[in-house]
Structure formats: structure tokens, C-alpha cells
Amino acid sequence: MNTRFAFLGLAAAAGLVAFVGPKDEVRFAVSEGTTLTKSFETSMEMSLDDLIISFNGQELDPAAMGADFDLADANGSFGYVLSVVDEYGKIADGKPAMLRRTIDTLMGEYSSGMGDSGSESAPIEGETLVYTWDAEEDAYAIKLDSEDTAIDPEEYEMMAEDLDLRSMLPKDSVSEGDSWTIGGRDMMGVLVPGLDVNKAIDAANEEASNGDVPIELEEFMDSVAEGMVLELTYAGTREVDSRSLMVIEIGGDFEQNLDLSDMILEAISAEMPPEASVDLSVVIEMAAEATGEMLWDGKAGHFASMDMEMDFVMVIDARGDVDAGGQAMDGGIEAEASMHMVRKATAE
């Protein structure tokens, strides 16, 4: 090769490397023996913003149907707190192979525009769970650390191991400005910390299939999750309390339309008399916008904090016509609801 061209090629390669910039690894890399205290707080404000009920072409007031209802009171709030102490006994293949988790706090509280309020703590508070990775089952085995504790396994068997936000990490090394996405059940797991979404959906689907209403909840939940996507962007580093933390910006703006007509019609057909005919339309339109950021401690290999807000709007348009033995009737419901959610998480 001509020496001049060789030098030009090397110079071009060096320029390309400089243009691409250095790559950083945002990865879970906690050392064995590490203990982390983690806190997750979720608050939601919900409201029913509009409701129209019609029957045989006439708009109805819910109060006229005997319902004690005022749209101004159709709102409420919900709060959820989970705090744990995680002890990492063994790490393998980028995840805990053995983890001891003490549940310090697991409680929820609510209030409504009707004046109702309350709170409840889980029986698992104060207990320690042991997660052990089972390679053959490709899943974690969960058990109580104390065999003397009489707690129903239902209280903890759906508690997810991943409270490290690992699902939010990029698959490869990244440069500042690089983006990636998470969606579906991974995103649902971020919104509901501590819940094993796959197990919860499987359990709900099994319960529904054993009941009188043959609704495929798994199909429904996957349809809802399909359009939910978060975009994550690596925004470089930031000095916080003498630590250099990696900044991951969180964003998302998505819409989803669901036509549940066939699913609901199938569910109610078994309850209808043979001579009845039903024409049904149920459409749900959803839109959401998310913003926030996660700070990742690259040196320690775990998240330091996450703050995220999400605004969610849902519009339901349900209409039906029934002809039962020559007696025809029609009705419909139009409703619009909204929710503002705030999620905060810390690990130290």
C-alpha cells in the first residue's frame, strides 16, 4: 500500500474515532457483599373528568338512576411506599445469583373525593426474603429467611427480584446522546416497583379463566402494554455530592387505541338469553407523556436515584344495541379520566 494513502487512512480512522467519541458502560456491577438501602415512592392523582350516559337516545343523569354521584367528587389519590435493604450474596451473569432482601416498609394509602380514606401495610413488613437464581427454571426461587414465620406465600411470591432498575439499562456501551427504548412488560415493571408483572398477569389470567367471565386478561394487558414505550437517552455525567454520576434522561409520548368489542361481547354472550341479539362497540383511547431522569453510579454499579412523572388520559366510548324477543333498546357511555403519577426511587 502506498505510504501516503496509509497515513491518510490512519488519519481518517483517527478522525472517525474522535467524531464518534468515547463509549461509556452503564451497567449493573454491584460487588458481592454489598448492602444497599432502597426506597421507592409512588403517588397518583386520578379523576373522572367527564361522563355521559345515554339510554334509548336520551341522556341520563346518574342521580336519576338512584346513584349517589357527583362528577366533582369523582377523584382520588393513591400512595405506595416500598423500602428494602438488599444484601448481595453472589453475583453472576450481570444479576444477583443470591440476594437477601429485608422488607422495611410496604404500604399503600388512598383517599377519595367522597371522603373515604385509609392505609394498609403488608404482613411481609419486617421479614427477610431470600432470592436464589435457578438456572434450570430460568427464574428466581423465593423463600422466607425464617422458617418460623407463618406468612402465606401469596404475600411475597409475586415480589420481583429486580429493584435495581436493570431493565432500564442499555444493552451495549453508549456515547452521550445515544438513545434506546423499553416497553411492554418491562415498562410496566418500572411503573409498579416490586411487582413481578409476568407472575401477576399469569395469576390474574388463571383466575379469570376459572371464573364465569372468559376474558383473556393476558391478551388485554399485552395489548395495553404494546403501545407503552419509554425513550431513554444517555446525557453524560454530573457531579453530585462529590460523585460523578451518569445521567439517563427519561421521555415518552405515546398513544394507544384498543377495540375491546369482540372480547367483551364474547364475555357477556354466555349470560344472554338465546333469543337475544347484541351489537356492541367498546373503544378505549389512551395517551400518556412521561418525563424524568435516572442517575447511575458507574463506579459502584447501581442506580443512585430516579425521578419520573407521567400524565395519562383515557377516553372510553361504549355503545350497544340489544334486541331481546322483539324488544329493542340501546345505550352508551362516554367517559374521560386522567391521572398524574410521580415516581421517586433512591439507593445508597
Name each model feature, range by range.
Residues 20-348:
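Signature of exported/secreted
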Residues 1-8:
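Bacterial N-terminal signal peptides that target proteins for export
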Residues 7, 13-25:
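Bacterial Sec-dependent signal peptides at the C-terminal "C-region" and cleavage site
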